[in-house]
Amino acid sequence: MQLSDFSFELPDELIARYPLETRSASRLLHLDAKGQYHDHMFTDIIDLFEEGDLLVLNDTKVMKARLKGKRATGGAIEILVERMLNHTTAYCHIKASNSPKAGAELFVGADNIPVIVRGRHENLFVVEFSQPILPVLEQYGQLPIPPYFNREAEEIDTERYQTVFHNPEKIASVAAPTASLHFDEELLAKLDQKGVKKTFVTLHVGAGTFMPVRTDDITNHVMHSEWCDVPQETIDLILATKARGNKVIAVGTTATRALESAAQAHGGKIAAWTGDTQIFIYPGYEFCIVDRLITNFHLPESTLLMLVSALSNRENILAAYEHAVKDRYRFFSYGDAMLIDKLEV
């Protein structure tokens, strides 16, 4: 399967660089189990879900992971904290005119807080902060909004690039689980009133989510690693949902990857799991848990487009995307949503 099989033309003006005034005011394109698409508003999910269905949401929180700084010589640098190893050490991306070497001292924030480059881990730098990382990020960091916004993070992003249900204790992502950004408290309450249940997994989203696929044959692509947790409480609800004939609805590709990683770790069995995942889902993958997926519109030739193509199929997804472009849906993180049903075979 070739990378070019997942290409499509997207006019630049359809990239949503700011959120709508109301979270749940976005549009929804439903791709059903027969491969037919239907136009809706996002709030229509109340009518598209059944009593007893289960929403699975990712409760991670986005860090203000981007830090501006400088070298001892004064040259500008930028640090993106990818993963904290302990309260003062992290794997980081560093942008600089020349790659810093082990032992280099850098300074971040307006108060020039010292950090030391301790070495490398694969394509990342091991960076030791002279103070606890999270307070430094909270005071001096910026939310790492996606590169295709072509702008710096603004005040509106502080609220709108976080989900309303994030767990403050789980602050470790460098990108939002964006399908969840469509849910506000009012919509969640209405779903609850209908009898749609909800549960949580955690997947801390890494910067690798924005990395392009660089191999022509997609099966040669190596996925980035992300930490996830699928607790027993969530598994119990999934098993009960399936036992009564209801649907498990993953909210976002991150929730999907967490759930399917747990199943793959147990040979396809639905069971709890915590660990690092590099799962790469593309057409031909057999889903073990996910019946339906709420997701945003994804970049051409991205691993996320490949994932959604595995749930329906590539032809149906690209036809739906072509319709979305013609009908001027808004794309990417602050854009509109899709509801994709597992294709009937």
Swiss-Prot record:
Reactions accelerated catalytically: 7-aminomethyl-7-carbaguanosine(34) in tRNA + S-adenosyl-L-methionine = epoxyqueuosine(34) in tRNA + adenine + L-methionine + 2 H(+)
Recorded hits in Gene3D superfamilies, A to Z, give: QueA-like
Superkingdom of origin: Bacteria
Q: What are this entry's molecular-function GO terms?
A: S-adenosylmethionine:tRNA ribosyltransferase-isomerase activity
Q: Where is it found, in Gene Ontology cellular component terms?
A: cytoplasm
Q: What does the record list as GO biological process?
A: queuosine biosynthetic process; tRNA wobble guanine modification
The EC number(s) attached to this protein equal 2.4.99.17
Task: Tell me the compartments it is located in.
Answer: Cytoplasm
Task: State the UniProt keywords alphabetically.
Answer: Cytoplasm, Queuosine biosynthesis, S-adenosyl-L-methionine, Transferase
Subunit structure and binding partners: Monomer.
Q: Which PANTHER family match?
A: S-ADENOSYLMETHIONINE:TRNA RIBOSYLTRANSFERASE-ISOMERASE
Give the protein's function.
Transfers and isomerizes the ribose moiety from AdoMet to the 7-aminomethyl group of 7-deazaguanine (preQ1-tRNA) to give epoxyqueuosine (oQ-tRNA).
NCBIfam families documented for this protein: PRK00147.1, queA
Name of protein: S-adenosylmethionine:tRNA ribosyltransferase-isomerase
* Taxonomic classification: Bacteria, Pseudomonadati, Pseudomonadota, Gammaproteobacteria, Moraxellales
Q: Which gene encodes it?
A: queA
